Design a protein with these regions (language model features):
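Glycine-rich short-loop/terminal segments
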Residues: 1-73, 140-165
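A generic structural signal for solvent-exposed, polar alpha-helical segments
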Residues: 21, 33, 92-93, 98, ...
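Phenylalanine-focused residue identity feature
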Residues: 27, 33, 41, 80, ...
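Acyl-donor binding region in acyl/amide transferases
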Residues: 44-118
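C-terminal "cap" of GNAT-fold acetyltransferases
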Residues: 102-161
Length: 165
């Protein structure tokens, strides 16, 4: 679970899918899934979906991974801002966020080459937003960041989200 061929992502975006940010203790008691095509996710005892990694050559789609994660008990996750719309379209609603912290930058992130992305904390609601829906434009990134104050750090943003789950 902690190894990943970063060549399966575009070089520009490989850092965004960082399974190395979790250590062994995060997986104790977790339900771990690895598809035949090498895509992964895990669901912790408290319903946190971690290590979502879609192998580009896998037949299984990203939305199918999330559906399986929810069926396995997943009800929340956090992700870099670049995945914002993907999670909105797949039943997750943003709750809180914090600024990118270079001290916790994932392996492969290069300062100056890639824009630092905020970390967004989502809860599962089951409501799938499409670009055609009015709600989508009300919750879109720009609106979300205007409406929701930035949390001072990762733990604070996580706590805010967890109170809503």
């Amino acid at each position: 679970m902690t190894e990943r061929n970063s060549g399966e992502q575009t070089e520009k975006d490989a850092w965004r899918v960082d399974t190395d940010s979790h250590d062994g203790k995060d997986y104790v008691g977790a339900k771990v899934y690895v598809s035949e095509g090498g895509s992964t996710f895990a669901v912790t005892k408290d319903g946190d979906i971690i290590s979502v990694c879609k192998n580009m050559s896998d037949k299984e789609k990203g939305h199918e991974l999330l559906e399986k994660a929810v069926k396995a008990g997943g009800k929340k996750l956090d992700s870099f801002d670049g995945n914002f719309e993907f999670y909105l379209r797949n039943g997750f609603e943003p709750v809180s966020w914090t600024a990118f912290n270079e001290n916790y930058a994932p392996k492969g992130w290069v300062k100056g080459r890639v824009k630092p992305e905020p970390v967004v904390f989502f809860k599962y609601t089951g409501k799938k937003y499409s670009k055609q829906s009015k709600d989508f434009w009300e919750i879109k990134e720009a609106q979300f960041y205007k409406k929701v104050k930035m949390s001072k750090d990762y733990d604070t943003a996580m706590s805010i989200r967890d109170k809503e789950v």
